[in-house]
Amino acid sequence: MNYSTDNTRIVDRKKVPAPYELVNKYPINDEISKLVYGTRNEISQILHHKDDRIFVVVGPCSIHDPQSAIEYAERLSIENKKFSENILLVMRVYFEKPRTTVGWKGLINDPDINETYNIAKGLEMARKLLIEIAELGLPAGTEFLDPISPQYVTDIISWGAIGARTAESQIHRELASGLSCPIGIKNGTDGGLKAAIDGIQAANHSHVFLGATKEADIAMLKTAGNNDAHIILRGGKVPNFD
């Protein structure tokens, strides 16, 4: 008897568009590419103390309603222009939520917030929203949680984050080493710095690992390393101020 030993706990499977399909469906224009390229470089200059402005990522905990996000972006873009000489503002546009146990995992995973998990719809909504925000002249930052989803949106992301719950993950450190944008790594949920410091050192280096391409092929990827990795102090058992 040949026993079933493969995918025995997978109960459903639905195909989603390959990254290149959504990228081609919702391409970025020259102005958006200029915005993303320029703000990535500006963030890098600030991180390396070659620009004395303050870099601030501001916005909601996570995106659940694209229309509300656009209204927020419209207001933030006004402030961005007002304070641009002293502050580089990036809008926090988080589509994925890491959970300590279970709960809603974000717009990409469950865009209708009703446990229907229409990931194809979520990916499309995420890309469309990022383009609309960029058209306002506002750079966007996001947390990278799933190792495949970056292929759908990273060309519109000026800054990225690795969360406290994934800072020690080898997969996410490898991912950070290959991202085209500056990447912040949070300190651990206990407030300790070691996970973030180790994560930065790992992200600085080249890595070789399995990953997905824009064509949705599985490939060996080799990264150059990310010298714009830095710590995000999230606090722990007490606030950072204390």
Role assignments for model-derived ranges:
Residues 2-7, 86-242:
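Active-site-facing alpha/beta catalytic cores
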Residues 59:
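Conserved, mostly hydrophobic/aromatic
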Residues 35-53, 68-82:
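Generic N-terminal targeting/processing segments that precede catalytic cores or assembly contacts
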Residues 62-63, 238:
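Short strand->helix junction
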